[in-house]
Amino acid sequence: MKERMNELVQLLNQYAREYYTKDNPSVSDAEYDKLYRELVELEKEFPEDILPNSPTHRVGDLVLDGFEKYRHEYPLFSLQDAFSREELDAFDRRIKAEFPQADYLAELKIDGLSISLTYVNGRLRVGATRGDGTVGENITENLKRVRDIPLHLPENIDLTVRGECYLPKASFKTINAERRENGETEFANPRNAAAGTLRQLDTKVVAKRKLATFIYQEAGPTAASSQEAVLESFAKLGFTVNPRHIISSSMDAIWQFIEDVAKERAELAYDIDGVVIKVNSLALQEALGFTVKAPRWAIAYKFPAEEKTAEILSVDWTVGRTGVVTPTANLTPVQLAGTTVSRATLHNVDYIAEKDIRIGDIVVVYKAGDIIPAVLHVVENKRDQQVPLPIPTVCPSCQSELIHFEDEVALRCVNPRCPAQLKEKLIHFASRDAMNIIGLGPAIVEKLFTAELICDVADIYQLTPENLMQLEGIKEKSATKLYKAIQASKANSAEKLLFGLGIRHVGSKASRLLMERFESLEQLAAADFDDIAAIDGLGIVIAESLKTYFATAGAQKLLIELKTAGLNLTYLGKKTASDAALTGMTIVLTGKLANLTRSQAKEKLQSLGANVAGSVSKKTSLVIAGSDAGSKLEKAKTLGIEIKDEAWLESL
């Protein structure tokens, strides 16, 4: 059996490398899963023969309490940027002035997250983010779930390597399709999705998403003589190395490589944002050294934002939650930075006037920050008889008169009952940074609003599972899950609720500062203007906005309705030792909670003075157990630790 287990480990690790390196595995997912299950069963039967590099070590159900800071033994430096051939030539002249014989290795600049992996005696000890280059975050448990990161090297060596963790384009599309179906906000791009994944506290989420890596640098002393030799040694150790690179002493050849890569960019299985050029010789790298911020022996050429021409077919005017009316151009479809673009923002009426944008114009389109399609300028020599774009005078949603205030560039609808604003306010209220009602995304809000089941935020808390099942595509399981998420949000600290109300100028930071000062929404509503304005970091604009809002009958009625519905209106983040019921206690959460999310339960416990731990020990004061509680509950019983349920927590 030991031989078969070894064979399965080697096969599964090989298939994982094929998948991530070539995006073309030699076996189907079904065959991989079959072999994986066979290995799992064998490891259950023969636990003494489990290999340290077994792929089963990657998958688990850890829920982390957070990420600890990690100080890098060797700092991660930034690279000097270049945006033109002239800047690359200047870099070449500087290098060749000292070392005429120098050659370069040029490799793809992966658009992901920089990571550092430290191995001790061949075993992965620490995986960390770059952070500020000196201190990052320890995300070892999450990186263990990335299948192409070796958990155990074939040699018992101490080694620290650097690389990029990224999300392949195919995985990105799959994840966004799932989020769309669940009514969740889609990720803007693969890099954001990768970043969000690596900061997940639930490692099961990380294991499910198919993150991948390219390793490209060794930190600290090395026996290799060149960057090329470093990459070759990485491949032998089982790391994924990007095969697309060249070595040349000629900047002409390097520039040709850059141009070739730029043409291939859209066809690659992953996002890149440039090409990194390094002096190949490690001895020359050491001689050239570093500036305060960057190595002198490397430079990163950044691709310019891709631009395409398209015709403006029409312009839509949409209303946001604050009443701002934003113009968006409908375009003839063009391929831009790997996606089909048929719409682009025109920002505001002043921007339209400044650029003299008209229906039928041929315009240059680009992606601002490689994310948001926008119109750069009009191609005037292609203009024919186009007439200036008519600017709306009434709201496209409610037909109320639009206002263009002197101190603003935007048109604004000031009707508080505007349907478009109401829907956007509901979406904002349920969003992650506000009440974080998982599953209540734009698509579900639209259905609920159209069905006249909700009109304002208080209506959300009158919904029942039966109401939710009236919606097309919502079955009992989904309805129950969303209902529980709505109920769980009632326990949020008041700064979340304040931000969710969408009061003009009151962002998440201001909401926290206000709640730290006044401790409840009711106290804030009754507060003096001067007391609000005196808070460091706020001022008279926010004070005026709050006083105006809370003076309205609608706001006063809403507070009463939310309190009646059972929402917490107090700040939970500033309990003192004297009034914190659980001060000094170490509490462990285990199992699935019915009404609270794990983060909400943790937040409530901490607000009551408890220290929330991730594992049970003799120091544990009590364990709160939900359904399907496992080994933590059993250990607590063995140690004689007090056990409570979710109802006890909710009663506090």
From Swiss-Prot:
User: Which reaction is catalysed here?
Assistant: NAD(+) + (deoxyribonucleotide)n-3'-hydroxyl + 5'-phospho-(deoxyribonucleotide)m = (deoxyribonucleotide)n+m + AMP + beta-nicotinamide D-nucleotide
Q: What class of enzyme is it?
A: ligase
The cofactors it requires, by name, are: Mg(2+); Mn(2+)
Q: What gene makes this protein? A: ligA
Residues annotated as signal peptide: none
Note whether S-adenosyl-L-methionine occurs among the keywords: no
Query: What's the protein called, per UniProt?
Result: DNA ligase
Binding sites annotated in the UniProt record for NAD(+): D29, A30, E31, Y32, D33, S78, L79, E107, R130, E164, K278, K302
Q: Function of this protein?
A: DNA ligase that catalyzes the formation of phosphodiester linkages between 5'-phosphoryl and 3'-hydroxyl groups in double-stranded DNA using NAD as a coenzyme and as the energy source for the reaction. It is essential for DNA replication and repair of damaged DNA.
**Organism phylogeny:** Bacteria, Bacillati, Bacillota, Bacilli, Lactobacillales
One GO molecular function term of this record is: metal ion binding
Question: What EC designation does it have?
Answer: 6.5.1.2
